[in-house]
From Swiss-Prot:
Gene that encodes it: tolB
Principal location listed in the UniProt entry: periplasm
UniProt xrefs under Gene3D superfamilies: TolB, C-terminal domain, TolB, N-terminal domain, Tricorn protease N-terminal domain
InterPro entries: 6-blade_b-propeller_TolB-like, PD40, Tol-Pal_TolB, TolB_N
Complex formation: The Tol-Pal system is composed of five core proteins: the inner membrane proteins TolA, TolQ and TolR, the periplasmic protein TolB and the outer membrane protein Pal. They form a network linking the inner and outer membranes and the peptidoglycan layer.
UniProtKB keywords: Cell cycle, Cell division, Periplasm, Signal
Function per UniProt: Part of the Tol-Pal system, which plays a role in outer membrane invagination during cell division and is important for maintaining outer membrane integrity.
Species of the source: Desulfotalea psychrophila (strain LSv54 / DSM 12343)
Stretch forming the signal peptide: 1-35
Name recorded for this polypeptide: Tol-Pal system protein TolB
Entry GO terms, CC: periplasmic space
Length: 438
């Protein structure tokens, strides 16, 4: 028979079981919760504290004893590559004299990178581990062996794996940055790593080269050159440096393509019929379709990650503004209304966010917007210099842009929340028009 007394007894028993279950879950999860406190789901939120990492000097496990310069150089490269991601704070080695036996918890470290190296004739072996300080547990271990010229790429691979262990997203230490360098009245395209350690000259036209663009897989790079007397579009196979071919040699403009996600076609600006319009061409340069046919200028297309939309710049309203086009229907709508001019859009590879430059109070500043949202654009830069040519990092967390201080152009980076703005390279001459690929 069900009575009020039995009901109360059942309720009490249920509450007790629920309480015991909660205690059990909490007891088993305390260690996990402590570790979870250091894994930040929104790693670019303004209020998120940076992950504190110690990178002591590497130890020598081979013959010849400790080689201080090598030990310090390897650790320094690891530290700089991790810090570049904008979510890592490196504890200075001066606080623990670079020793691997330091009390990491006392130093306030969340993690420590512990490594060793061994020299071979013309080769080096690296053993690198990532220690979770709170758990006193190695959460990542990697071993690499290669030529001395492969030392930095091996370090970058570890850093990418370490960032993935901490955030769930692969790092960008192994990514490549292409840019235009201006020196001695010529512009050519160069390519380098995130730290500017290894530089490769991609073009040698001894003329003006503009608008480098990676294909989505990063294996090819297209650019426009004036070396033949007029602007032509070329593409080079980065895996085979000498393989370069003409992609479009049409009369007039052949400019700034955006490559489709499948890499089989690109959209660029051609002026073969007079006005600069957007066309889609295949890998052989054949025109597949014309996308715009209105008076005015239509330039700077950028593909969405799914390949269904583009954002581009048009002055059809009187001044340059951003427009969104659905490629299947060709439906187009204006996106920007604030700012005297809005130009150079670049679509994030991981989300619906457009980075672009906007002319405000006489200066170009970097903004971002969601093309499918009514939310207002977000301003990232505000200092009294000129900011142009924004481009997203492969992980969608950072933006490179060109800053002009009235004397020279330099490449800067900033997190997508507007934090950690800094100059990226210290090369001679001027650098601009950066592009980023894995």
């Amino acid at each position: 028979m069900i009575t009020m007394k039995n009901i109360l007894k059942l309720r009490a028993t249920g509450l007790l079981l629920l309480l015991l279950l909660m205690i059990s879950v909490l007891g088993n999860g305390i260690g996990q919760a402590m570790a979870a406190d250091r894994v930040y789901l929104d790693i670019t939120a303004p209020e998120t504290r940076k992950i504190k990492v110690a990178v002591p000097w590497f130890t020598n496990t081979g013959e010849g004893g400790m080689k201080a310069r090598i030990a310090k150089d390897i650790a320094d490269t690891v530290a700089k590559a991790l810090k570049f991601h904008g979510i890592i704070s490196i504890i200075p080695t001066s606080e623990y004299k670079g020793r691997q036996t330091a009390d990491w918890a006392k130093l306030g470290a969340d993690y420590a990178v512990l490594g060793s190296y061994k020299m071979f004739p013309k080769k080096i072996k690296l053993e690198i581990r990532l220690l979770d300080v709170a758990e006193n547990n190695i959460i990542l271990g990697k071993s690499y062996k290669g030529s001395m010229s492969q030392q930095n790429p091996m370090i970058f691979k570890f850093c990418d794996a370490a960032i993935k262990s901490l955030t769930g997203t692969e790092g960008i230490a192994s990514s490549r940055i292409a840019f235009v360098s201006y020196e001695k009245r010529t512009k050519d395209v160069f390519m380098t790593d995130i730290l500017g350690r290894r530089i490769r000259q991609v073009t040698r036209h001894n003329n003006l080269v503009v608008s480098p663009r990676f294909t989505r897989d990063g294996n090819f790079l297209s650019y426009s050159s004036y070396h033949s007397g007029s602007q032509k579009l070329y593409i080079t196979d980065l895996r085979q440096a000498k393989i370069t071919k003409s992609l479009s040699r049409r009369k007039g403009m052949n400019l700034a393509p955006t490559w489709a996600p499948d890499g089989k076609s690109c959209i660029l600006t051609l002026s073969k019929y007079g006005a600069p319009d957007l066309f889609r061409i295949n890998q052989q340069g054949k025109i597949l379709e014309q996308l715009t046919s209105r008076a005015g200028v239509n330039v700077s297309p950028t593909y969405s990650a799914d390949g269904r939309h583009i954002v581009f710049v048009s002055d059809r309203s009187g001044r340059p503004q951003l427009y969104l086009m659905e490629l299947e229907t060709k439906q187009t709508k204006r996106l920007t209304y604030d700012g005297r001019e809005n130009a150079e859009p670049n679509w994030s590879p991981v989300e619906n966010k457009i980075a672009y430059s906007s002319l405000r109070d006489g200066l170009y500043q970097i903004f971002t917007l969601d093309p499918f949202s009514a939310a207002p654009p977000k301003q990232l830069t505000s200092d009294l210099t000129r900011h142009e040519s924004p481009v997203w990092s492969p992980d969608g967390n950072q933006i490179l842009f060109t800053q002009y201080d009235g004397r020279r152009q330099q490449i800067y980076a900033i997190m997508k929340n507007g934090s950690y703005q800094r100059r990226v390279f210290s090369f001679p001459g001027s650098q601009s028009s950066a592009r980023w690929a894995r």
